[in-house]
Amino acid sequence: MSLQATMTAMGQAARQGASALRVATPAQRTAALHAMAAAIRADAPAILAANAKDLEKAGAGGLTAPMVERLMLNPERLEDVAAGVEAVAAIPDPLGVETARWTRPNGLDIARVRTPIGVIAMIFESRPNVTADAAALCVRSGNAVILRGGSECIHSNLAIHAAIAKGLKAAGISSDAVQIVRTPDRDAVGAILGGLNRTIDLIIPRGGKSLVARVQAEARVAVLGHLEGLNHVFVHAAADPRKAVEIVLNAKMRRVSVCGSAETLLVDRAAAERLLPPIADALIKAGCELRGDGPSRAIEPTMKPAVEADWSTEYLAPVISVAVVDGVEGAAAHIAAYGSGHTDAIVTEDVAAAERFIALVDSAIVLVNASTQFADGGEFGFGAEIGIATDKLHARGPVGAEQLTTFKYVVRGTGQTRP
């Protein structure tokens, strides 16, 4: 069978799996999620052995350090994966929920009710945990999913998927609901972008800029984009110095390879000489390289000079760009020029300044006095996330189970006819 025929058959099977999930009860979907988590734990030795193969290949292939860090699984991380599936099981089932209801003068009762999207294709790179997160969120929201991970993590993904399939079978749910592309052939991506003979309803890319750009340019079905995290922390003149140090240090250094990591520090010119030195000192002691503009280097001469490309670079490494700006307006202008619309934060004790920042910064997530590393579906109470959507339609910010639904209008009458 040709690759195109194989992929088309996968799409048709996914459509059948979506139909089965749509009519499954919330209790059945919850049971499936618990069974999936149990199977991941039971298969931990096989999954970690598969991950070791991917890591060995990554080392020989010269994969970048941030990519390797994202790829790596250990017992603790794998337990987090299983716990994440259980967290999705614990969130309220989004299907069948009435989001609005009203009665017309003619007596028609109209309700807007959440329903699954249908079949979702997930194209992602480096992160084997996405296999479990995407599967869990799609099962919770009643969607079938076709997973296509990167070749760098194919062994890990296949092992996790095998565990998920066991869990689904144990719960009486068809394995057609969660399928994985087993070949690293890039033509498989092209087939998915073509919609697999109109069986795919939504494509979600999660990876580097080039992957997302290709999907958005070539897809013949709807795309929910997850762009890079060019995130900023703006330290306002009215910031508490202690909070500023702690928030910036956490935003940058807690885990540098995640999309919620801060890549640029903006400091208010009105207080830069007071606020910047302790922040810079803390970052340097933590092993972070600072690349600053002229005004910031005048305050902290140890910084390397920033070049134009730095302001639009997602480092995913212990590196941060630093710029001095003129208040909230200057910070917002810098973010508008270089940001990705992902996550941006302000540190300030001035409520009016915070509200002005919120109004001016048009990002999916805007934080006040909190680290950008909270840009995560689990931290939002979504159980897990399938990505951070930076577009404005259909969802925005962390994409959890609720964001993977659409709606239908249910109209109940008593025999009305239209005059």
UniProtKB/Swiss-Prot annotation:
It is found in: Cytoplasm. CDD domains: ALDH_F18-19_ProA-GPR. The keyword Isomerase does not apply. Its EC number is 1.2.1.41. Coiled coil: none annotated. Keywords: Amino-acid biosynthesis, Cytoplasm, NADP, Oxidoreductase, Proline biosynthesis. Pfam families: Aldedh (PF00171). Pathway: Amino-acid biosynthesis; L-proline biosynthesis; L-glutamate 5-semialdehyde from L-glutamate: step 2/2. GO terms for molecular function: glutamate-5-semialdehyde dehydrogenase activity; NADP binding. Its main location: cytoplasm. GO terms for cellular component: cytoplasm. GO terms for biological process: L-proline biosynthetic process. SUPFAM superfamilies: ALDH-like (SSF53720). It is an enzyme of class 1 (oxidoreductase). It catalyses: L-glutamate 5-semialdehyde + phosphate + NADP(+) = L-glutamyl 5-phosphate + NADPH + H(+). It comes from the Bacteria. PROSITE patterns: PROA (PS01223). Belongs to the gamma-glutamyl phosphate reductase family. Catalyzes the NADPH-dependent reduction of L-glutamate 5-phosphate into L-glutamate 5-semialdehyde and phosphate. The product spontaneously undergoes cyclization to form 1-pyrroline-5-carboxylate. This is Gamma-glutamyl phosphate reductase. It comes from Caulobacter sp. (strain K31).
